[in-house]
Amino acid sequence: MAFKDLRPQAPVHLLVVPKKHIPTMNDLMPEDNALIGHMLQVAKTLAKQSNIHQKGYRTVFNVNAGAGQSVYHIHMHLLGGRMFSWPPG
């Protein structure tokens, strides 16, 4: 499933969320590899549908509080529509 972030950090800020409950990336098991691969394919499709696939976009998993995770059900952020810098803030 995918939907718009409630507090967008970019013109395009979508969340890709699996149905299976996995609290953090640290809880992934080898059998979840296909699920993560599917999430990346969904992000690629959404980037194209959002017309950000050519200029560039960022995908992010935040893991635990120190990295900014506030919802303990893994989800991938898809951000685009503006320039990003490195390192992130």
Predicted feature locations:
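HIT superfamily nucleotide-processing domains
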Residues: 1-89
